[in-house]
């Protein structure tokens, strides 16, 4: 598979994300994958598979709309919007979060992925007591 084919497969994987698709991860990610996001750092394919399984376990759904893909020699950049619903956040209402991913390839598979998104907007602002505090702090920081 080529780097471009892997990238297309990754986009399709995220746009139709659910736990039944986790078996596709070895076709997309290198066995030495290092995935970094605001939650933490996850090293190795088995660890990344478990991380996805845990994330999806309690979600009502989680899907991505990829709005931009830029491919370079051994790198790529994605811009995306994640739409998700979790019973513990906002009473299970649909949530939306924009973010981006930087990808690096080795042997036509993704060996490094860093996801950038606002963890406050995703989680902290949605929690009952903490959310109002975070929003007040953000308001104070505005000019």
Task: Please place each PLM-identified region on the residue numbering.
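A solvent-exposed, acidic/Ser-Thr-rich amphipathic alpha-helical stretch
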Residues: 4-7, 22-26, 30-74
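Short, charged helix-to-loop "capping" segments that act as catalytic/coupling loops
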Residues: 18-21, 87-89
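Short, aromatic-enriched amphipathic alpha-helices that serve as compact interaction elements
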Residues: 2-20
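Intrinsic disorder/low-complexity detector
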Residues: 20, 39, 117-120
